[in-house]
Structure formats: structure tokens, C-alpha cells
Swiss-Prot record:
Tissue specificity field: Produced exclusively in the posterior (PSG) section of silk glands, which are essentially modified salivary glands.
Species of provenance: Bombyx mori
Major site of localization recorded for this protein: secreted
Protein name: Fibrohexamerin
Hydrolase found in the keyword field: no
């Protein structure tokens, strides 16, 4: 009787188990050598370059904010805490032949003198300038590698998520015109910041992956 019950239970378990999951996790999330070797085995990247500095400066970084018809340029952009980013997800989907790599970056800090050019039909740009220092509780970067594209990071799509909410920031106008223009209405700040981080997503993800895990040779 017991043997019959076990047999029935085994059949029930097999029936409820369904097809095997296509998700395969080849590495522990903190095993960067394993992740690096896995990426290198599926691409042309060179593993193990080192680490991003805790602080570094980029002379000029331009990004677009389409919602506000504006182009922004960060001058002498200082980035802090990029070295604190950590891998929070890494898996292969054997069915779709894609690999997902997510990186969580807590308290990224950006400091720069920022120029804004707002574009309008039939008019020249309105150009403004201000100092800004912003700290972001958590920026989450998810990159999807495609085996059909040889796991090419340089053309892979990265999604940027303000997972920790809006930044804590300080702004100081560089001239009177900018002081009069800057709005104290922050109703649309979430739209601006989503587009801002979208504009920086490739640089943030690709520089971390290439410096910390495997160098794909991207021009960020």
C-alpha cells in the first residue's frame, strides 16, 4: 500500500512540475571571475581589467531630454561611487538565447557645470547655465545580451531604472537669466530624471562592465 502511495505521489509531482525552466544561472552574483569568464566564452571581450575609480572626471558629456525639447551638456562632470555598483542579476535564457545582466548602483553622485539649450520652432535656442550636484539613491541598469549578435555589449540595449526614487540635489544658477528661468515646480522632475539617466545609461553600464568584468572595447 505504501509503495502504491509513493508511486502515485511521484506521478503527481512529475505531472505538476511541468517543463524545465529555460533560465540558467551559471554564476554566483558576487563571483565576478565566473561572470567575466562566461561573457568572454560567448563574445570577443577581454576579461578582468580591474576596477572603476571611486571618483573620476569627464570633460564633456552631452545628453538629450526630448520631453522638454532640450539638449544638456555636463562640463567637467565628476562622477562618484561608480565603483560601488554591484551585479544583482545574471542569467542565461536557453530558449531565447539571451543573457540578462543587471547592475545596481547605490548613491551615484554627479557634479558638473551644466549648460542647457532649449529648442523651439522658428526661434534660436535659449541657452542657460548652472552648477548641479545630485546623488541618486539607487540606479538599476539591466543589459540584455543577444547570442545572435555575438553578445556584443556595444550594441546591446540597457534599460535604466530610478529604482531608489528621485535624487537629492543642489542647483546654483551661473547667471541672472538662469536664476529667473529655473523653476521651483518639481511636478515633472520624474520625467526629466528618467530621460537624464536614460541618456547616461550606456556609459554607466558599459564602463562598469568593461572595467570590472570584461572589456568589449565600446566607445561609451
Amino acid at each position: 500500500m505504501l509503495a502504491r502511495c509513493l508511486a502515485v505521489a511521484a506521478v503527481a509531482v512529475l505531472a505538476s512540475a511541468g517543463p524545465p525552466s529555460p533560465i540558467y544561472r551559471p554564476c554566483y552574483l558576487d563571483d565576478y571571475k565566473c561572470i567575466s569568464d562566461h561573457l568572454a566564452a560567448n563574445s570577443k571581450c577581454i576579461p578582468g581589467r580591474g576596477q572603476i575609480p571611486s571618483q573620476y572626471e569627464i570633460p564633456v558629456f552631452q545628453f538629450e531630454i526630448p520631453y522638454f525639447n532640450a539638449t544638456y551638456v555636463d562640463h567637467n562632470l565628476i562622477t562618484r561611487n561608480h565603483d560601488q555598483c554591484r551585479v544583482s542579476e545574471f542569467y542565461d535564457n536557453v530558449r531565447t538565447l539571451k543573457t540578462v545582466l543587471t547592475v545596481d548602483c547605490p548613491w551615484l553622485n554627479f557634479e558638473s557645470n551644466r549648460t542647457l539649450a532649449q529648442h523651439m520652432s522658428f526661434k534660436e535656442d535659449v541657452v542657460l547655465s548652472f552648477y548641479i550636484n545630485g546623488s541618486y539613491p539607487l540606479i538599476r541598469l539591466t543589459t540584455v545580451f543577444d547570442k545572435g549578435n555575438n553578445f556584443d555589449l556595444c550594441s546591446a540595449f540597457t534599460f535604466a531604472d530610478l529604482a531608489g526614487g528621485l535624487p537629492i540635489f543642489h542647483i546654483n544658477p551661473n547667471d541672472q537669466r538662469t536664476a529667473q528661468w529655473l523653476s521651483k515646480d518639481l511636478t515633472l522632475l520624474h520625467i526629466y530624471e528618467r530621460e537624464h539617466i536614460f541618456g547616461k545609461r550606456n556609459w554607466l553600464a558599459r564602463s562598469f562592465i568593461s572595467r570590472t568584468l570584461c572589456d568589449f572595447g565600446c566607445q561609451h
